[in-house]
Amino acid sequence: MSAIVDIIGREVLDSRGNPTVECDVLLESGVMGRAAVPSGASTGSREAIELRDGDKSRYLGKGVLKAVQNINVEIAETILGLDASEQAFLDHTLIELDGTHNKARLGANATLAVSMAVARAAAEEAGLPLYRYFGGSGGMQLPVPMMNIVNGGAHANNSLDIQEFMVMPVGAENFRDALRCGAEIFHELKKILAAQGMPTTVGDEGGFAPNFKSNHECLQIIMKAIEGAGYQAGEDVLLALDCAASEFYKDGKYHLSGEGLQLTSSEFSDYLGNLADQFPIVSIEDGMHESDWDGWADITQKLGKKIQLVGDDLFVTNTRILKEGIDKGIANSILIKINQIGTLTETFAAIEMAKRANYTAVISHRSGETEDSTIADIAVGTNAGQIKTGSLSRSDRIAKYNQLLRIEEDLGDVATYPGKSVFYNLKR
């Protein structure tokens, strides 16, 4: 038995300089697991609750001392002595202890920090790398990365309404080459922007944040960077967008202020479809407002056979909402963010439900990250096939890519990289 003998929560900083929660879990053997939780900027209204102090005299009200206190007192009193290897039992204990449908009492940032730290401790105790602890001998597929090389929307202070413009190196033979491909495109894009007198400062997720005139112009420049780096768009590299449409949906219309457009749901579906006809776009995330289910039905009907339509704010890693979407034929993919739901067990349940329904699952970071690389291990352990963890800069993003390199090295010849086949539910 891997009995938990001590648990310590603390307030640390994330990549935006805002407080977040870190947790240490100590086992009877002396083994320790440590984990830190991320935080989002554009958030779905149905996400599990991130508990903040609200004390304006500390960190502008964003302190997390209440969540830390919940770990050090109430959660500690409940889980001390429990077996760390019983992840599902421990997570359900946390869920029941909280007693709300959205972790509002203890805070999802408290429950997730504990859940992750327990898993790390148990893996260490078992002498297993974390990805192997999660997935057993079956976890051997490296994910295709969605690399966010241009930031807009809530992630940057510029004129772009679409939040993320990403490249996906689907033509690579392995993850190592995919990472190199993304990095070379990133640096080529930097050269192009500098040559045009545009700023090469980066946004929250490490991508560039220039003031392009339109989404179309941004995509054209990215295509130029792909070619300049020596790759073929549409073959070696595909494109992906995160619209974060909930951020610019007002009064029943989609307001693309950077382009002076106000579009209905159907018109915005057509707008995105037109972009996909002009550029090799394979994935569109949150193409509709989280509550615009009629809009989601429309875009799924129009684009769902050829484009991966990812629900982030739509599904918030919640199996109850995902099941409703599956039953109604809404979207065809789910974004998996561990802090949207607050425990690893619930996270794995969402991934499994998606796979059973022939939906893809994309493991994701948040815009406020830490050096914690757990999501890299989750991506491989669950054979999710895709990961979204930012650009090719900022150490909080690179930490995940570097962990995936280590995992690929550890797996050796049994490691696989799916490339285009990861879009198994599309007809392209």
Swiss-Prot record:
Its main location: cytoplasm. Its EC number is 4.2.1.11. Pathway: Carbohydrate degradation; glycolysis; pyruvate from D-glyceraldehyde 3-phosphate: step 4/5. The active site is at residues 205, 337. (2R)-2-phosphoglycerate binds at residues 163, 337, 366-367, 388. Mg(2+) binds at residues 242, 285, 312. It is an enzyme of class 4 (lyase). GO terms for cellular component: cell surface; extracellular region; phosphopyruvate hydratase complex. It is found in: Cytoplasm; Secreted; Cell surface. Its cofactor is Mg(2+). GO terms for molecular function: magnesium ion binding; phosphopyruvate hydratase activity. SUPFAM superfamilies: Enolase C-terminal domain-like, Enolase N-terminal domain-like. Keywords: Cytoplasm, Glycolysis, Lyase, Magnesium, Metal-binding, Secreted. One of its GO terms (biological process) is glycolytic process. It catalyses: (2R)-2-phosphoglycerate = phosphoenolpyruvate + H2O. Binds a second Mg(2+) ion via substrate during catalysis. The keyword Nuclease does not apply. It holds the Pfam family Enolase_C. Gene3D superfamilies: Enolase-like C-terminal domain, Enolase-like, N-terminal domain. Belongs to the enolase family. Catalyzes the reversible conversion of 2-phosphoglycerate (2-PG) into phosphoenolpyruvate (PEP). It is essential for the degradation of carbohydrates via glycolysis. This is Enolase. The gene is eno.
